[in-house]
Amino acid sequence: MGHHQNEKLTKKLSEFAFDFSYDDLPSEVTEQAKLFILDTLGCALGGRTQAIEEVSWITMFAGSQNSTGNSTIFGEKERTSAATAALANGAIAHTIDFDDTHMPSITHLGSSLVATTFALGEELNSNGKDIIE
């Protein structure tokens, strides 16, 4: 693919993302997204209760970053930066290794995506609809 074709594709993708709305999603997609989020939050809760030592190391590392912001680490009261919260929450959600697996790529997308969207959502004062959108 040539440089000009890449620019066209990038332009199309950026226009699609800019014009995209929650209302464009079929209800099946929003319901699946909610289940995906709940599954990841359940894994994070499982990590907080079953992988106490690992979570302790994660939260200790996050606290050492001395970062400020409006985002929280799952199960903590203190606020931190979106980057620190995303990293810590993704690690916490993956501690018990029960998070979803995308089989073609053999990756655990939920722990990364949900952690990042929640951290950014808090930073931007977004609601659940905004996060799914």
Roles of regions detected by a PLM:
Residues G2-E133:
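N-terminal core-entry segment
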